[in-house]
Each structure stands twice: as structure tokens, then as C-alpha cells.
Amino acid sequence: MTLETDLRAASAATVRGAIERGDPLPGTAGFAGLVDGALVRDVLGRELVYVDREAADGGASAGARAGANGSASVWSFDPGDLADPELLPAGNVRPLRGDPAGEDRGEPGARQVWTLPDPAPETDEGAAVAAVRAAVRESVDEVGSTGLAVAFSGGVDSTAVAARVDAPLYVAGFEGSHDLTAARSAAAAIDGDLRETEVTHADIERAVEAVVAATGRTNAMDVGIAVPLYLVAERVAADGYDRLALGQGADELFGGYAKVARAPEDPRVEADTVRAARRETALGLPDQFERDLRAIRAAGVEPVAPLLHDRVVRAALALPGELLVAGEGRKVAFRRAVRAWVPESAAARDKKALQYGSLVARELDRLARQDGFKRRLNDHVRKYVEALTDA
């Protein structure tokens, strides 16, 4: 028997069907947890579940979820509950020793059940864009507005979400940052209720400690992304909202990165086509989710990512290369699709990565140098973060 509290973001029946059919995109926004004696995590890792290496291998009861009873904890949604946590890889099923319901799934140990589809490209460009439009519209509309706020940078991704929900918009950045300026402009264009957090050095120092504790990561890129996410989520929670909608995933799915546009010349990708480079970046999403979900949840709110619903993923994967990148334009199909409700000024706007658009990366560098960690040192921001947090 699978309890409702044992599985996040999907029904047990849906996950059972996905396992039986080998269906990687069964119509969910991701899932993770325990089903029929086995831990599961969706193909893109949009939810998190952890197993305790020693307890699971030692034969503790598979039902011993952290906090559930007095026995050894085998698994949890929170790695802090476990003595030796290991994140279940995306697309994997891991039967747990000692649970009769999992005996027919083989010996304990994770096995990959789902892989990201690689369909042939849609040859009808109009149909491809229409499919993206319908998928995004439905996925955003079904989010609902109860307890909802939107993380808003003023770019096409967050505006595609914000323009279709009745919820306040939140942005964090240093005064003069790209994100504050763009958010003000886009919020005015959609008549949105924008709430700004002007970040200070004290905010960074406080948030760094929180995100390192939550994520265990200290490198400059991960901290630079997690800090503004945490600060937005913290403000959202303080204002009484418990869900935070993000435009996460559009860059990875729709060809938003320069390295994808420059494939195969860009050394940051191994792929030899734009479509293959897009797939390569999409396969990196699970690692990002662990960072982002843990940082946002540490602030007390639940992240919602409608642009990563299975129906959007399926529509994106069917796009031909020319609807990902065309000349200097990126996310071609996505921009065309959401122009139905996104103002042109936002639909056409180039996006800066969160750590740069908020100026958090610049100010982390400044704080590190002020604290004696000079750029000539290898990885000076990481060293500063580790000194600040005793990591």
C-alpha cells in the first residue's frame, strides 16, 4: 500500500502505469517517493527523494521513512533526516530491501527505468509552435492562484507565467541591476503587482549561510543562483504566500543558452547539432533542481514550475533546430508561442542569468575580495563562501 504522504506530485496509479509502460512523460509535473516498496524519481528529477545508503543496504524496513516510526530511517524527502543520504538519480526506480511489495522488482539497487525521449522533429512549423502554445497555456492555467506568488525577472519565461495568473510578482536584485529594471518594465506592461527586494551585502551574507546549509554547495555559480532565489522565496513567505511559481526550464528545453546556439563550435557542449546540444542541457536539469528546490524550500515556500510539465517537455522535444535557434534569435518557438499573451517588449527581451541579472555574482566577488580572497587565488569566491559558513 502506498500512502499519500509517501509520494509527491503524482498519484501512485500514474507512477505504476509509467513504470509498466516505460513512459517517461506520463502527464505530470514530476514526482518522487515510495510506490509499492520502491523509491521512484521522474525522468527530469523535478522532485527529490533520498535513500540512506547504510540503512537501506543493511536491511532496515523499507517502510521506515524518516520521522514515520522509531526504526532506522531508510528514505526521506529531506536529506537532513538521514545519516548517509544519497539522492536517487532521475529516471530511476530503487526497490527497498525488506518490503514484500518490492520483491518482484528485483534486487535492491537503483535502475534506470525512464530516459528522456528523443523524437523526430516536427516538420510542420506552425503545428509545432501551436503545440508549444497549447502546452504552456494549459500548464500555467492549471497552477491556480491560491497562495501563489511569481518569481519575476521581466524576461519572457517569467512573464509567460505571470501574465496568466492572478498573483503578485517578486524580484530581488541590487539597485541598478538588469533584473530590477526589466521587472519594472514588464510588470507595467502586464499591469502586474511588482514587489521588489533591493539586495544588500548583509542580505547576501545571511542568505549565503542559509543556502549553503540547505544545498551543501559552495561554488560561485550555485551560490550566485541560489541566493536570489532564496531571498525572493523568503520575502514571499514573509508576505504570507506558500507557493512560488518560476519560469524555470524554458532555457534548457527551448534553446535559450548561447552554448546551444553556437553548437557544435562551443566547447561547452559535446553535441554537433543545436537539437543535440539542447538535449545535453536538458539532461543537466536534475542537478539544478536539487539546488533550486532545496534553496526555495529552506525559505518556507513550495516551488511550482509549470514550464516543466510533461506536456511542455513533450512539445519542446519535438521542435526542429530552426525553432530553437534562428540566426541571433534563441527560444524561437517559445517566443512565438507565448506572444499570444506576453507583450512584445518582454517576448523579445534577452535574458541574463539570475546570478548576473541580479548582480549577486558581482557583489559576491566584491565581498570575497574585500575579505582578502583575491581573484588571483583559484576559486576565490568558493573560498570566501566556505570561510563565511565554516563549510
Where are these regions (language model features)?
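Short, surface-exposed acidic
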Residues: 341-353
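Cysteine-centered catalytic environments shared across enzyme families
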Residues: 1-195
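Small/polar glycine-rich anion-binding or flexible loop at a beta-alpha turn
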Residues: 352-360
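Short glycine/proline-enriched turn or capping motifs at secondary-structure junctions
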Residues: 86-90, 374-382
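ATP-dependent adenylate-handling active sites, centered on carboxylate activation for C-N bond formation
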Residues: 125-327, 331-341, 359, 363-367, ...
